[in-house]
Structure formats: structure tokens, C-alpha cells
Design a protein with these regions (language model features):
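Conserved ABC ATPase "signature" region
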Residues: 6, 14-31
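Catalytic Walker B motif of ABC-type/P-loop ATPase nucleotide-binding domains
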Residues: 60-64
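ABC ATPase "signature
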Residues: 119-120
Length: 162
């Protein structure tokens, strides 16, 4: 782990202050002598998260950031994401675990079958569906879609107009 982190620091060759908060929170310094190929999926995910935040980027793209993490590590990472969001950073998160997103996101782009199904503010989505959780709000929309077969045709027509 230590070699990977040091190698990335050297490659980036940046004079900026490094954000080692996750490194300490995940207690990865204790594992610096371990080789990446010997790590569990969760520990590998922690290393990836540390590297994503290390150089204090203005934009973060996180693909399934909590996948493979234990509950404590997941909460640590979500707290870090919220801290960075509160600093005004732009953060994109892809996730199939919608329950993980409730405290993290303000907007949602929901894709289905490789197409954007909708793009809304989370508050609007919850208000329109009268649901408090993102996963339930989306399930409500999808359930309504399956009841209304004409919606797919109107969606195609809307796409053609745009």
C-alpha cells in the first residue's frame, strides 16, 4: 500500500498540501508494507478512496464508492464525501445502492437501459413521489412506469423533440 501511495505522489509531483484524512481514518498506515494483490476487496476500495481524495481535487468522480466496505468504513467515506461537498466541490457518484445515497446527494440522474430516464433535484423527486427515501421514490416512479405502457412511447417522443 505504501509503495502505491508514494508512487502516485511522485508521479503527481505536486507541491500542494495533501489530504491524508482518509488514510488516517481508515488506519491504512498500519498496512503500508502489504502488497496490493494480497488485500481484501474492501481494503483495496479504501486505498482507491484515499487516492481519489489525496490531491484535493475540485471534481471527484466516484464509481460505487462504498462497494465492498464494512459499515464503519462506509460511514467514514460518506462523512468525507459530505465534508468535500460542503466545501463546494463537484462530486459525481455512480451507484446501484440507492440507500447509500440518501445523505449524500442533491441531484440525481437516473439511467435505465443506457439512457437518461430523468434528471431531478432529490427534493423534487421526493416531493413528486411523496417518499422520504431515494430508493423508494425511484421504485415508485418505476412501478408507475410499468403500469403505464404509454409512458415509454411518450418518453421516446420527448427524446425525438429534444
Amino acid at each position: 500500500i505504501g509503495q502505491i501511495i508514494e508512487m502516485i505522489k511522485k508521479i503527481r509531483n505536486s507541491n500542494q498540501e495533501l489530504d491524508e484524512g482518509l488514510l488516517k481514518a481508515f488506519e491504512l498506515e498500519k498496512m503500508f508494507d502489504k502488497q496490493m494483490r494480497t488485500l481484501s476487496g474492501g481494503t483495496t476500495q479504501k486505498v482507491s478512496a484515499v487516492l481519489a481524495f489525496l490531491f484535493n481535487p475540485e471534481v471527484l468522480i466516484l464509481d460505487e464508492p462504498t462497494a465492498g466496505l464494512d459499515p464503519l468504513a462506509s460511514e467514514i467515506l460518506k462523512e468525507k464525501i459530505i465534508q468535500e461537498k460542503n466545501k463546494g466541490k463537484l462530486i459525481f457518484i455512480t451507484s446501484h445502492l440507492l440507500s447509500e445515497l440518501d445523505d449524500l446527494i442533491t441531484e440525481i440522474i437516473f439511467m435505465q437501459d443506457g439512457e437518461v430516464y430523468f434528471h431531478k433535484k432529490v427534493a423534487t423527486l421526493k416531493a413528486e413521489t411523496n417518499e422520504a427515501k431515494i430508493s423508494k421514490a425511484i421504485a415508485s416512479i418505476l412501478k408507475h412506469k410499468s403500469v403505464n405502457p404509454n409512458q415509454q412511447e411518450s418518453h421516446k417522443a420527448l427524446k425525438a423533440i429534444l
